[in-house]
């Protein structure tokens, strides 16, 4: 027989005592120590090594292990335990001799019950290990998700910064819970040390006296245990909150990841667009630099021209012509500059048009957002009739969006004002350019007039000089001829010679006077010509200086205008960039707000659909219950009617009975001479009928009371079921799956409908093409028959009934419809409108298809993420 008598139950473990006089009394042992030492070992108990709390933190087995012990002590079964206490040695022999089977049975019962009990210290230790392991796993997951998010987004997104801040907050909360956990550990260790000290004290006490059992209802033990359990519950609740928050963060991470993908695409498109704009702006800057260099080159050319004009003052006529040509070239250059300016103005107009187009695109985007917002508002209005609670929040959001809309409209007005200012500046520059053009035209006309006048004067002077030179030549020739005649006629008579000499002298004097007069006229004309040329040179120099100063002033003004325009261009580029950034931020904020509102509304709509489905199910159940209750009510009413009919029947029977009784009484009174036996018989019959009537009445009353109570219960049950406050909580995963399968089913149905429509269309096309082929074959056969008939006609007969013209069949005339003459008529408005309507419908269908695909992918990822999530 075993030493069951030496064991005693305690809430901590076993106590084994020795019954011999020479054996030392041993200390209380934990199950770990008891397992180390065999029950039959001799000597003092070796203290077992206490296992480390952290030895299973890195083990993956903890996730799948079930709790070894119960969370609480089964006190009811503990009370049923047999109180094994130390028995005096005088009794042991009698118990061992007489009650061995009973002792064996008690031992078995004791071991069964003891296996069901729990060890609170080990349970607490195991729970602490589990919590530590879960905290480490959460820590590792948090670090991995943070690193993944940082690697994916590069730390540029504000959402990532918010998430990092939120993760740091949860890290501090985790540290607080870890500190609380350490505090619980310290409390647990202090409790273990206290228990060990109590064990040591108990061992010291056991050396002098028998071991006492710590009662289960010890107040200190109960208080300590309750404190530990409260701490454990608090820690587990914090851990549950952390786990819920982790699940929310994981869902949020998936949504943010989707948003990051969309933002990445938008960022790439915006960078491409901005690169194109930068390229165009660089090209415009290069063009402006080229124009500036061209202006500088032309300025140098003009200065060189002025220097050459100063150097070539000798040949004035050629200089004037050359200057006029150069001025014409300069005017042509200025015209080219003006054309370039006009091209630049056109380019600026195109840039302004591009800005306006971008503004229109932003306005169209804003209109689309506003349209989506209006659709969303209409949906909200539809839902506000059923859900009054969400009305305040949605109205507040609508007010915020309206404020943002007003701000956006103000910004649009400011941009329009800036565009109007730019247009005014453009008009001013255009008017200045027009003034410059008119001035250049006046200068050109003045120069042409001066040129023509000077050319006329020069021609007149040259003609006068040539006439004078001719006269001088003629005079010299006549003088020479006279000298020759004098020499020839020397031999003539003196008188004739003297007369002739006198005449010739007179002629010579006349000629000399004429030559002097002509010389004086030549000198005066030469002086006038020199004076006129000097005056013209002075005038031309003054005009050239004036034009040079004017050209320099215009050049300086053009340079200033060019610098101002470049500054204005840079300012407009910066302003446009800032406007684009602000618009992108506002659009991004509106998009986020819209997405949040859409997601929130979608969630609310999903919840509403789920609640509606639940309500529909409840309504169907209630309708079925109502139908059943109505059937029961009809049955009860039928029973009541039958009972009332029976009651009326019994009343009539009672009336008949009373009438018979009254008649019998009358007969009895009339027939007093009847025997007493007959009277007694009538009385018995009357009493019997009366008792039956009372029993029947009582039964009917009880049945009516039961039916009324049943009716009240059914009405109360119906009211409870129809109470809208009693509703079951919806399962989000089930709702997501329902939405996913619903969308998949709708897509399949739509696809099948499209295939059916395509099939019908192809069948119609095949039927129509077959019919056309049959008609064409009939026409060809008809033509062949006609050709055969024509071959059989004799040669003397005409070619056809149409007066010798070739045969024109209906088949050939049929294709004349497709000639260019028949296609001169334009398309009708209805055809164009139907085509536009078809395009709009196709666009809407494609947009809805894309949205359904995105929703299906999102639900699929969400369901997979929820199913793959580790559940603790």
Swiss-Prot record:
Gene3D superfamilies, from UniProt? 1.10.287.1490, 6.10.310.10
Keyword Cytoplasm in record: yes
Residue numbers spanned by region Disordered: 15-121
Q: Cite the record's Acidic residues compositional bias ranges.
A: 65-74
Location of the protein in the cell: Nucleus; Cytoplasm, Cytoskeleton, Microtubule organizing center, Spindle pole body
Q: Which GO CC terms are listed, alphabetically?
A: cytoplasm; nucleus; spindle pole body
InterPro entries in UniProt? Spc110_C
Coiled-coil residue windows: 176-723
List the Pfam families hit by this protein, alphabetically: Spc110_C
> Keyword Cytoplasm, does the record have it?
yes
Sorted keywords for this record are: Coiled coil, Cytoplasm, Cytoskeleton, Nucleus
Q: Give the similarity note.
A: Belongs to the SPC110 family.
Q: How does it assemble?
A: Homodimer.
* Known role: Component of the spindle pole body (SPB) required for the proper execution of spindle pole body (SPB) duplication. Potential role in cross-linking filaments or anchoring other molecules. It is essential for growth.
Full protein name: Spindle pole body component 110
Organism the protein comes from = Candida glabrata (strain ATCC 2001 / BCRC 20586 / JCM 3761 / NBRC 0622 / NRRL Y-65 / CBS 138)
Task: Specify the taxonomic lineage.
Answer: Eukaryota, Fungi, Dikarya, Ascomycota, Saccharomycotina
> What gene codes for this chain?
SPC110
